[in-house]
């Protein structure tokens, strides 16, 4: 078990705020929009660690995941990764599995509040049970195939489940964007809100859920994510292995 005060202020890139059992998880970079980095101690490791603690905390009953400012995540900083070799990729491989698996191990409802463009790790939001998106939000995977990297860190599994195999492959190969309204039409966005009302609406839904029996929430989340967890268990490690081999080949190793 985890106790919120023991980890609430532990993370540099993840701001945690809890009120009445509702936990807001906000990713950021020095108080501004988050920048994704897989360097040692970067958000790639921190967010998975945060999900691990949240999953072990019986005091949290609903989670709201969001970004900072007008952007969820659009930038990647590769400078901090350092020399890419087998040991570095072993670390990234482990962190990549933890990121997805620890998120899915959270046994309370997760609401994704999409505050703007989500072009990097948009799957973290769309894996939420309820996705509330700003009218300005767009979803894409621009950090993999468009940059010569294999999309193997779970996006190859989840976007296929959301969009179907052909649409997902087009989405991942091209880095094309899907707007909030189109996401709602396709079924992975629940509600589209005015830009300045997204987080507020997510909290409204969180309060509605919070009023329901806690064990019902936990057991429902577990039932609804079991098939996703099974697919990730089967295919996430394989995808990460191929992604690592591709990265090393790009570097001539």
Which residues does each predicted region cover?
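Conserved CoA-thioester-binding segment of acyl-CoA-metabolizing enzymes
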Residues: 1-66
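Hydrophobic/aromatic residues within transmembrane alpha-helices
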Residues: 25, 65, 124-126, 183, ...
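CoA-thioester-processing core
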Residues: 99, 103, 118-171, 205
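Short, well-ordered beta-strand core segments
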Residues: 110, 117, 131-132, 192
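Glycine-rich beta-to-alpha transition loops that act as phosphate-gripper elements at the mouths
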Residues: 113-118, 172-176
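C-terminal long alpha-helix characteristic of the crotonase
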Residues: 132-137, 189-236
